[in-house]
Amino acid sequence: MGNLRDKIWLLGETPGSHHKVKGYNLPGENKMTPIEGLEYFDIKNLCRMKMRSDMGMTYMEDPYIVDEKGSMEKLSLTLIGSCAWRPAKGKRDDMDEILEIAKKDKRLVSAINDDFFYPERMEIYTPEVLAEQREILHTALDRPLEFWSVAYERECKTGADIYAHAKEYDLTTLWIWYSENIDEMNKYLEWGRSLTKDGRVILGVYMYDYGNARPISDDHMKKQLDFTYEKLVSGEIEGAMLHSSCNMDIGLSATQITKEWLDNIK
């Protein structure tokens, strides 16, 4: 089974970027950086996401993946950022940046398409385009980079036809956007495992109820973490991804609950 903590990721975003989205209704002020988030939780794997407010910033000039203390062991970068993000003019993604960084930094293990399964995105990024992205990631360097997606329980609930696209990915990161749906996590995990050929899933763990724009209840937070631990131990998921550095320092009880949960994982 190995060390379960080695399977835990943090989703890291530019400080304050979520507070710029008024609909999230986040309290407080966020100053924590992604690397500080890793250090606070004492975990080693970072998934760096680009939001709309990061448009125009290249990863080569990104201060939030600079790791002077050696806190990070694995890194994933968004090939396509959040739903409001757009690539630089003349580009369709951040592939060139990712490959350039990966040549120098062996910690970079994957590229991820965030907020992917919207009709508008699937129309632009067809299965053929995704297959091309995957082939580049797998073969352009002296080692393969994995190709990950972000999927939500809402796509399962609506019955959206996403399978032709989803099967082009190596792994699905699965997220429960509305906290009330935590009560049906088994159903959504089964669906998430059906999306790729090998059924590989990293389970996303929200520390804020973004769907309802409010703090997640302590009961739902604990239930979500208990379920995640159970599936880590059973091997039904490859890992968990905590969301995110953007809500860890704004006074939410979920942060402390998660830290205590992590402290009991070996």
Feature names for model-found ranges:
Residues 1-266:
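Glycan-processing catalytic domains of CAZymes
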